[in-house]
Each structure stands twice: as C-alpha cells, then as structure tokens.
C-alpha cells in the first residue's frame, strides 16, 4: 500500500 514499502521491496 505505502510507496516506501514498494521502494524497499
């Protein structure tokens, strides 16, 4: 959901 999670994974 969060953009930061997408950047990390």
Curated annotation (Swiss-Prot):
Subcellular location: Secreted
Modification type Phenylalanine amide: residues: 9
Record key words, sorted: Amidation, Neuropeptide, Secreted
A GO BP annotation: neuropeptide signaling pathway
Main location: secreted
GO cellular component: extracellular region
Source species, domain of life: Eukaryota
Family: Belongs to the FARP (FMRFamide related peptide) family.
Name by which UniProt lists this protein: FMRFamide-like neuropeptide FLP5
Organism: Penaeus monodon (Giant tiger prawn)
Organism taxonomic ancestry: Eukaryota, Metazoa, Ecdysozoa, Arthropoda, Crustacea
